[in-house]
UniProtKB/Swiss-Prot annotation:
It catalyses: a ribonucleoside 5'-phosphate + H2O = a ribonucleoside + phosphate. Binds 1 divalent metal cation per subunit. This is 5'-nucleotidase SurE. InterPro entries: SurE (IPR030048), SurE-like_Pase/nucleotidase (IPR002828), SurE-like_sf (IPR036523). SUPFAM superfamilies: SurE-like.
Amino acid sequence: MRILVSNDDGIYSPGLWALVKRLKEVGEVIVVAPDREQSATGTQVTLRQPLRVQKTHPLIPGIEAYAVEGSPCDCVILGLAKLITEPVDLVVSGINHGLNLGDDVLISGTVGAALQGYLRNIPSIAVSIPVTMEEPENLDSAACITAEVSRRIQNGDITKNSFLNINIPDLPLSQIEELRVTPLAHKTHIETVEEGHDGRKRYFWLRRRQLSSADNKKTDIWAIENGYITISALHERLFQQPVFTLKDAETAGILAAARSCQDKI
């Protein structure tokens, strides 16, 4: 099994190398990751400037590793298209230092990187662990869970067209009671804008704040808050597509009314 590993915290992030350490027990690992922090870049792709790549010294011997001056999505696209010459069987993004729950997935560079594998028909995993003021203490817990999920994809126990978002409490696995398959919670954060002045110009900070704790016991946020590991199956739209229908008469009426409006100009 050949595994491309990327992230959005940068190529020297401890979470990435904790993941590599366990995934190398599953298959051949190639790292293609940003050369610097790229959090909250979502699905950003670089189109108006060249991408520069440096083969770099790995923190674990025997691993082929590339640092890219680009986004997490750039890394996976470039890795699959040019840097890795043999077919890739799995894309894994993480371990992100910070959970990716609910609508976080819409702006997550970690999830965005995994999405690029899934869009190319490669099973893909995004994995995250909470972080506060300190570095996570149990990165190996997240790495072991991800390695086991990877084995089950390899063996066919988990469908090979999977796009999975895994979040793991910062605890030893012996203290985690259960792993749950959960849907994403909706409307989990609110953005606010703070204004300041540096003596010359105004500036603004965007702040993202979590809303009150989830009370729906089926969602990923509730499960994590109660000490469970969560696995959420995603697809290219990230959230389930809402049901939206219009009768033929309604669609015709909209078009007719719009034409009438345009005729008045």
